[in-house]
Amino acid sequence: MILKADVKGTGKKGQTVEVADGYARNYLIPRGLAVAASEGALRSIEAERKAQQEKQQRQVAELSALRDRLDGQTIQLRAKCGEGGRLFGSVTNKDVADAIARHIGKPFDRKMVELDAPIKTLGVHLVTLRFGHNITGKVNVEVLPE
C-alpha cells in the first residue's frame, strides 16, 4: 500500500508499507488514506515527490535572493517621540515588516522579523530576519523622529 496521508502507527505520506489485507480493505482505502501499490501509483507518487522538491528548491532560491537583497541594508522608519528620544509607543515587528515591504515593493510577512523586544528609542537598531529553511539575515532599522 502507498500511504496518501500520515497514518499513526503505520507510516508517513508517500511511504510504501505492507499491512494486513483487512486493515487496508476496511480502514485505509475507504478513508482515502492509501492506494494499492501499482506501477501507475508508484510513478504518480514519485512525480509528486519530484514536484514538491522542485517547489522547495524554488522557494529556497527566492528566499536566498531576498536575503541577499536585504542583508545589511538600512531601513528607515518614522515614529512620534518625546524628549530624550523616547518614542510614544514602540516600533513592533509589524512596523518593521511594513517598512521592509515598502522598501522591496512587495508584501513581507511580519513573522519573519525577529525582535527581542519592541524598539522604544530613536537610532539604529540591528534586527534579525528569519526567512525559513534556515535562511537568516540582518537589517539595520533606523528610527527617525516624525
Swiss-Prot record:
Cellular component, GO annotation: ribonucleoprotein complex; ribosome
Record-level Gene Ontology MF annotations: rRNA binding; structural constituent of ribosome
PROSITE patterns per the UniProt record, alphabetical: RIBOSOMAL_L9
One Pfam family matching this protein: Ribosomal_L9_N
Disulfide bonds: none
Annotated SUPFAM superfamilies: L9 N-domain-like (SSF55658), Ribosomal protein L9 C-domain (SSF55653)
A GO BP annotation: translation
InterPro entries referenced in this protein's UniProt entry, alphabetically: Ribosomal_bL9, Ribosomal_bL9/RNase_H1_N, Ribosomal_bL9_bac/chp, Ribosomal_bL9_C, Ribosomal_bL9_C_sf, Ribosomal_bL9_N, Ribosomal_bL9_N_sf
Keywords carried by this UniProt record: Ribonucleoprotein, Ribosomal protein, RNA-binding, rRNA-binding
Family that this chain belongs to: Belongs to the bacterial ribosomal protein bL9 family.
Function noted in UniProt: Binds to the 23S rRNA.
Name this polypeptide is given: Large ribosomal subunit protein bL9
Organism encoding this protein: Symbiobacterium thermophilum (strain DSM 24528 / JCM 14929 / IAM 14863 / T)
Upper classification of the organism: Bacteria, Bacillati, Bacillota, Clostridia, Eubacteriales
